Amino acid sequence: MAMEDIVGIIFEDIEEVKPILSDSEGNDLEGNDLSEAILEYGISEGKFLCVDYGGEEGSEIINYIMDYEFSHGIELATQEELEELDEMEYDDLTDKIKEVNKILEKAGYGLFCFPTGSDFYELFIAKLEDKEKLLEEKIVDDEELPLEERYIQYYV
């Protein structure tokens, strides 16, 4: 699968993001340049939630889910489920992400982690029907990163 396909899944409208797929001279971006452009665009457009590995400040993940629900006109979790997630105590952020995914999967969605090679998780919501496509493409080409951290992650 090409990165353009992954971009289309993450951002849902490939026409919207075509400008980030090339440089100012019209040359297609590749490798780490492309993944960096995707990250920057995703953050600027609110498609990615940037969370420190140390954990959330406040209710960042819950607010992100609620914003996604509002902008897409869908319900991914009940108010009760969101409140339980908000009150959850955890030592590792991936533990909370796993709990979020247990809830979102009921609606056919998941919370995925875009690789960064930094001290932050870049999270995004996508349909589970696209899970295999999202997980198969190497996103970051950095030999210093463990192999699994070069791919989009889905924690269960």
What is the meaning of each model-derived region?
Residues M1-V156:
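Contiguous interface-forming segments/domains that mediate binding rather than catalysis
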